[in-house]
Curated annotation (Swiss-Prot):
Species for this entry: Methanocaldococcus jannaschii (strain ATCC 43067 / DSM 2661 / JAL-1 / JCM 10045 / NBRC 100440)
Protein's recorded name: Uncharacterized protein MJ1389
Domain of life: Archaea
InterPro entries xrefs: Roadblock/LAMTOR2_dom
UniProt cross-references to SMART domains, sorted A to Z: Robl_LC7 (SM00960)
Amino acid sequence: MKATENRKVNEINEILLPLSKNLKNVEGFVIVSKDSLVKVGNIDGEDLEIISRHMAVVMGSSEMLYKRFNDEVEYIEIKGKKHKIILYNLDDFIFAVVGNIKADEIKDKVMELKFKVNNIDGLTAENIIEEIAL
């Protein structure tokens, strides 16, 4: 089981490391299930739980709206005066990036996560962040 967890951590690190190195304006990330259970993230404290709950609500509402048009949500961009939050739809999971970035710049890399996150139950934020400096 430990070898499987390590492999999953390495696969996700391979995707996240280039994102963190190339994008200086990324302040944090979180991967949550659609029912708002945090899987991996580097946002501290209460903010992580609050953000994950809101992410699930926003994504769920958007998916319901898009189904009415026979379409699917790829990502949602929420822009404030100082920050941006981009929510990427990874089927059963949501990947959120907080910072001052353009959604299209990292979309392809983030979408690679869609094939990797479905079995990340053993991952922790500490495992991921060990090799990532966001």
